[in-house]
Amino acid sequence: MKPSYLLQLRIAQWILGTWLVLGLAGAVLPHAPSLLTGLASDSLALGAVLLLAVVIGVPLGALAGSGPRWADVTLAFTTDWIAAVPVVLLLAFLRPAGVSSVGGLVLLGVLRALEVAWVVRSALLRAARLDTTWAARSLGYMPLSIFLSQRLPAAAGPALAHLALTPVWTFLLDAVGTAAGLGAASSPHSLGALVAGPATGMPSAVAAIFAVVALTWSLHRLGDHYGLRLARK
């Protein structure tokens, strides 16, 4: 590996570690500054959303990409329908209905899972076109161990790259929802809500935006690295 690439990995790991430490401090300290509280809120929200996206999205995408035709059609219809309805509009209907912050996180996780599923499905179909043995194996029985070790890693890189955008995605939803008077998508204490709040000063807003952009870059670098490692196995 090139020294510059290794340096980027170290910086990405340092940024992620700093986020976790500051987020823990914001969750533990009784009178933490609003920026630390936002880091803590976003850390918990991102953890929940990413967990749901991986647990639901990867198996769903694998089923659509290498399973029965109806699974692919259903996923395509669902993702097209979700894409036509902005998440902010969904919040406009769900918030007045009394949906809690936990319910909002579940909604974000499910929406992210559908997007990840589509990315995994597309990556598997693209790999099938490049691998001449895929179609032959698909006609018969493909052991689960072969699918997990040889097929699914082909989708690791695109899926991790897509998941790396989750911090910016959540931040923008929180900021737009707060500015529109609908409330933050994940938490009223999030960084997006902090930036869109009327009482937030310029230094805090700039620091919050920088933190989100830095975390997104960090996750993208780490996702690219580990995605390549999985694809080479």
Q: Where on the chain are the PLM-derived regions?
A:
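Periplasmic/extracellular loop-to-transmembrane helix junction in inner-membrane transport proteins
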Residues: 1-13, 25-51, 194-209
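Transmembrane-helix boundary motif in ABC transporter permease subunits
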Residues: 2, 22, 26-30, 45-79, ...
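Transmembrane alpha-helices
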Residues: 43-52, 56, 144-177
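Hydrophobic alpha-helical transmembrane segments of polytopic membrane proteins
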Residues: 51-53, 92, 96, 179-181, ...
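Generic hydrophobic transmembrane alpha-helix motif, especially the helices
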Residues: 56, 66, 71-118, 122-126, ...
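C-terminal transmembrane helix and the adjacent membrane-cytosol boundary/short C-terminal tail
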Residues: 68, 108-111, 157, 164-165, ...
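Non-cytoplasmic
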Residues: 92, 100-101, 105, 109, ...
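Short cytoplasmic-facing helical segments at TM-TM junctions of multi-pass membrane proteins
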Residues: 119-155
